[in-house]
């Protein structure tokens, strides 16, 4: 009998400690989420700049395969999509140079031009996140035939730039250069 009481007492102590942890945990506020998103965009900008600075300027025209985009074109696509997707998510006007033919313009494909457009796109996304209204994050948007929330589209914008930066890792490696180390924090 004494063992049963002791086991019951231990069980209820354990259960009580779990319940107190759960009730003392606080949910993230919208401001916390917005701050984390801004921090992630700042980190992504710094990480992408490491990629831009790792690839030699004379290799920006390099293509992993003839049918694919060059390194410069990948990064210009990233820049255009950053602005277009984030503008759609936040109902802001896109930057004046935002055009899906930007990546095909020879004048935009130099290392200096690519760095300009990419950095401008990250600054645009950072400002859009910082100035976004969390009360509107649940509003629906339709893009490319898909309906999603503004918040989800902001997240998909981040996912998209991660995907295209990641693709350029192969371009750097094929030039016998070590790509930047992963930057999770």
Annotate each predicted stretch with a short phrase.
Residues 106-140, 152-160:
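Acidic/histidine-rich alpha-helical segments that form the ligand environment
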Residues 47, 51-52, 86, 124, ...:
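Well-ordered alpha-helical scaffold segments within catalytic/enzyme domains
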Residues 42, 46, 80, 116-119, ...:
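A broad detector of short, well-ordered amphipathic alpha-helices
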Residues 38-42, 49, 59-102, 142-185:
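Short, contiguous alpha-helical
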Residues 1-30:
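Bacterial Sec-dependent N-terminal signal peptides
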Residues 27-32, 95-107:
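Acidic/histidine-rich, surface-exposed loop or edge segments in extracytoplasmic proteins
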Residues 27-46:
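Short N-terminal segments immediately surrounding and downstream of signal-peptide cleavage
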